[in-house]
């Protein structure tokens, strides 16, 4: 396979997680009887531009269906993050009623609702019908298409250039990263700013976050790779912030390469130096990741088998994509994890892809009173522990598997 950005031949493997169905392909009682589509889940490293990427097997339309079940608004932590983002950007870049904000991957309007509340004109791009409908219900204008240069040029022709674009947790989700990034260069006004948030590859590898790898994530990103890709597609990076979200993310600020309005800030240089010092521009950094992932898999499986032998009941919390990667890689089935609780009604009464574990409402947890609750979205551990603190009443304990097994 050739690199999605620079077309170099890919020869360095990062990890092989076997085969699994798309992580958001939840099953209904009807589809439970049919066979599922499994795709290999292998990740390779480009030794030229250092873009880390999944091997090509699945098409985008097989991964992001009309009933895609991830709704951003079901995480209170994420809503607070979005509200603060809008407040910070409004202040930093002097946005007002004469400005125009465009969000790519607007999801259910979780972020643009705060721009709308401030009276700033905004537009969302969201190719998934279920979440697009939820955003429209909040009064947000949505274009239901995949983003790229072609769509950006159409907006420009309609006079819809952007003062600010937001793209949160989507840069990793696009198969054609060059066309996607080029779209922002086309869409921005001359002095416009594009922000991108994505999980930081440095954390993924150093903290063993292999369960954030799934088919919908085509790319795993460092600032080193992103800066190179942006420069090749008409954008220059002028600032970067490190965020706690999703186990450690970056927010990258970019402008049109021909803008020259803002100097590159010290944060960019510092982070590039840190990535270089960690070895991210050398092959040895990426070797050994498979072994660390295998340990998590083995430790979780051993814990679940031991709990079963001891007659303990174990439930899961959070029917998240990362949980599906972990459970399928570890070969966990309903005999070891009886059910998974999720607050999102769109997921309830369905089944996790691959492992086919039933998804239920939280009420079920209170009635069943399990001995252990495995928190699958470990990045929300504190939020979930607060929300489910009542399991302590029956001496229930919380479990997370990543970066290492933790019970208590």
Question: How should these model regions be labeled?
Answer:
Residues 246-292:
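Flexible, glycine-/basic-rich loop-and-beta segments that form/coincide
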Residues 191-199, 397-401:
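Conserved beta-strand signature within the Rossmann-like core of class I S-adenosyl-L-methionine
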Residues 97-107, 314-317:
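Conserved class I S-adenosyl-L-methionine
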Residues 166:
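A conserved beta-strand element that flanks and buttresses the S-adenosyl-L-methionine
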Residues 1-77, 241:
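N-terminal juxtadomain amphipathic helix
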Residues 108-119:
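Conserved SAM-binding loop of SAM-dependent methyltransferases across substrates and taxa
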Residues 194-219, 223-225, 230:
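Short, glycine-/aromatic-enriched active-site segment of Class I SAM-dependent methyltransferases
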Residues 178-193:
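A short glycine-rich, Lys/Arg-flanked "PGG" loop and its adjoining helix->strand segment in the class I
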